[in-house]
Amino acid sequence: MNPINSIQDALYFAFQRKHWAELRKSVPLTLSQAELENLRGMNEKLSLDEVTDIYLPLSRLLNLFVGSKQQRGLVLDKFLEQKASPGPYIISIAGSVAVGKSTTARILQTLLQRWPEHPKVDLVTTDGFLYPLADLKRKGLLQRKGFPESYDMKMLVEFISAVKAGQKEILAPLYSHVTYDRCHDEHQAIRQPDILILEGLNVLQTGLDTPIDTRRPFVSDFVDFSIYVDADESLLKEWYKQRFLQFRKGAFSDPNSFFHHYSCLTDDEANTIAANIWDTINGPNLSLNIQPTRERANLILQKGPNHLMDRVLLRK
């Protein structure tokens, strides 16, 4: 027996797509085809059927969890005889490069903010918490971008802690995929949302992953519900190569792009470079740092070919 499957059987309820879709119950589809087009990621053939079968049941589940936390807050208010400030419900979304985390995050944000109980849903990506490009170069970490050490974890934890504490306004740094760098003069203002979705590669990490300093808080300490978007590495590598080819024709063609020199590559050259980037950076980061955190998630979305979800694992 595969030990990974054995662990998952012990920790999770497993649902094939058909059975998971039945858990939607009567939740209405409030997303139009036009809206879906704006939310869809590069190379993803996401359909309204996928939203109906996978994301509507998930939004129903999350709505129930958020409601449970809100009720708990009322209990605390009554016990303390004062208004407690529980802060927003925080959902983290982890997974490999090219797996479709951003699309999952955007769809959930759109669906969750249409529930009347929690209309204000903000989405923050951890890309903005990468060290600035100059710092990465100075530290010799440019080829380790995306690895845990390339993030300003102190800054990220301070941000998520302030959000959880209910601070009125917190500024999150933004990231430019054109300049491949943090935006130094642009920020995203977070003002006491009902729900915060935090999307990034390493948001499931704990002190177990950094034994040198196990006492400091981690992002996962502040998260109420965690999601891991999963797929076989062979699929992930192929999706990454496809995305690289799309970027070559699109974002890389911008003269201001950090990767503008890739825009003149032939298809064969682009495929070779993308495969090498995967084999030397993204693949090792997946196997060493990202995939080992998978079984910490409250829910695992497993993708098959064409980015279609075929299995959902819900922690018992």
UniProtKB/Swiss-Prot annotation:
Binding site for ATP: 95-102
Name of protein: Pantothenate kinase
Pfam families hit by this protein: PRK
Superkingdom of this protein's organism: Bacteria
Keywords annotated in UniProt: ATP-binding, Coenzyme A biosynthesis, Cytoplasm, Kinase, Nucleotide-binding, Transferase
InterPro entries documented for this protein: P-loop_NTPase, PanK, PRK/URK
Pathway listed: Cofactor biosynthesis; coenzyme A biosynthesis; CoA from (R)-pantothenate: step 1/5
UniProt-listed Enzyme Commission number(s): 2.7.1.33
Keyword Nucleotide-binding (UniProt): yes
Annotated GO biological process: coenzyme A biosynthetic process
Compartments where located: Cytoplasm
GO MF, one example: pantothenate kinase activity
Reaction(s) catalysed (UniProt annotation): (R)-pantothenate + ATP = (R)-4'-phosphopantothenate + ADP + H(+)
Similarity section: Belongs to the prokaryotic pantothenate kinase family.
One of the record's GO cellular component terms: cytoplasm
Top-level class of the enzyme under EC nomenclature: transferase
Gene name of the encoded protein: coaA
Database matches in HAMAP family: Pantothen_kinase_1 (MF_00215)
Keyword Kinase: yes
